[in-house]
């Protein structure tokens, strides 16, 4: 099992890679990093030897664009001009695909062993209300379509890992959806990236890490009972904890009033999502046994950190919890 920690190329996040001493300090106990390329890094900053995996672009709201639903775009963005600004180009499928194709280029350039792709979709208001317009089936079908286009003609290459969230898509609440989603993708080198914190977020009764741990085992058990070997399909794990059930219930009962531009509304949404999806070290007794049960090829400590010292401290805490 290879161990990595999450890193982005946002300004300031990966700067330590220019310092070999600090890089070695940050990587203590780890085999590499799982990188998300947001800003193009300066030439030579990211040593391909350090990159274990690459996290593909996260686009929370994309279904209306993909299906050519102009009314859906107007309902979400207010104007088509705002939608074009959000997506960074014309309102076509190619604009969305270009974001993911850029990731494939970077994966090849950096020699990433695996890629992570979110199987989910959520409009801004749905992040608060959790009352969704689209079904798991609709989102998974569209995701499979996207991935089949992106990987068309590829018989081999990086391991493609489908990640669970708590919105519509492959959220692991329904074993038949998990099975069908994995089978729908034609690219052969594939598996699941199970995010433990995201899975905790599917149950708003989870308010402690112990409850979250028990819930994850229940989900695995439910898949086994349904005849699907979830542990066998899980090739990667994003290890973290999110115990925000009470917050989710409170916000759902009294969602905020969303005003201003789409950028203003998404800013409020992202602030809430980071409260909801806490990405803290998962340290409950039994987390080591969970990792051993899942037995992934890749384990990434995916945590929210404030600076280099905070990252190193939290990554160390997470590693110690599974020793």
Features from the language model and the residues they span:
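Histidine-acidic metal/acid-base catalytic patches
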Residues: 1-3, 97-102, 106-113, 187-194, ...
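N-terminal pre-domain/capping segments
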Residues: 1-102
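Hydrophobic faces of well-ordered beta-strands that scaffold small-molecule active sites
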Residues: 2-9, 31-35, 50-56, 115-117, ...
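Acidic-and-aromatic substrate-binding clefts and catalytic sites of carbohydrate-active enzymes
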Residues: 11-18, 29-45, 60-64, 94, ...
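Short, flexible/disordered intra-domain loops and linkers
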Residues: 12-16, 64-66, 70-72, 125-135, ...
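Generic structural signal for well-ordered alpha-helices
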Residues: 21, 41-46, 100-104, 143-151, ...
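Residues lining hydrophobic/aromatic ligand-binding pockets adjacent to catalytic sites
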Residues: 24-27, 35, 108, 128-140, ...
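Active-site acidic/histidine proton-transfer and metal-coordination neighborhood
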Residues: 89-191
């Amino acid at each position: 099992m290879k161990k990595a920690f999450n890193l982005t190329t946002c300004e300031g996040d990966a700067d330590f890679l220019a310092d070999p001493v600090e890089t070695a300090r940050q990587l203590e106990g780890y085999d590499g990093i799982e990188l998300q390329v947001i800003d193009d890094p300066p030439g030579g900053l990211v040593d391909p030897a350090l990159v274990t995996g690459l996290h593909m672009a996260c686009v929370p709201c994309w279904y209306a664009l993909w299906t050519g639903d102009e009314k859906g775009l107007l309902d979400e963005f207010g104007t088509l001009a705002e939608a074009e600004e959000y997506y960074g180009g014309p309102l076509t499928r190619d604009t969305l695909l270009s974001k993911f194709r850029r990731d494939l280029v970077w994966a090849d350039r950096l020699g990433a062993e695996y890629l992570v792709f979110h199987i989910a979709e959520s409009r801004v208001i749905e992040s608060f209300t959790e009352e969704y317009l689209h079904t798991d089936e609709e989102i998974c079908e569209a995701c499979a379509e996207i991935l089949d286009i992106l990987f068309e003609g590829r018989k081999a290459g990086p391991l493609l890992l489908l990640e669970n969230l708590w919105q519509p898509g492959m959220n692991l609440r329904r074993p038949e959806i998990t099975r069908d989603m994995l089978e729908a993708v034609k690219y052969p080198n594939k598996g699941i990236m199970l995010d433990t914190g995201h899975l905790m977020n599917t149950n708003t009764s989870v308010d402690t890490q112990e409850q979250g741990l028990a819930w994850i085992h229940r989900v695995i058990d439910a898949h086994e009972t349904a005849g699907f070997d979830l542990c066998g399909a899980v090739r990667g794990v994003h290890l973290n904890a999110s115990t925000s059930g009470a917050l989710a219930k409170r916000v759902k009962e009294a969602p905020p009033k969303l005003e201003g531009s789409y950028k203003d509304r998404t800013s409020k949404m992202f602030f809430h999502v980071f409260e909801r999806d806490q990405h803290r070290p998962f340290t409950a007794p039994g987390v080591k046994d969970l990792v051993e049960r899942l037995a992934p090829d890749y384990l990434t400590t995916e945590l929210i950190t404030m600076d280099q010292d905070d990252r190193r401290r939290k990554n160390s805490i997470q590693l110690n919890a599974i020793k």
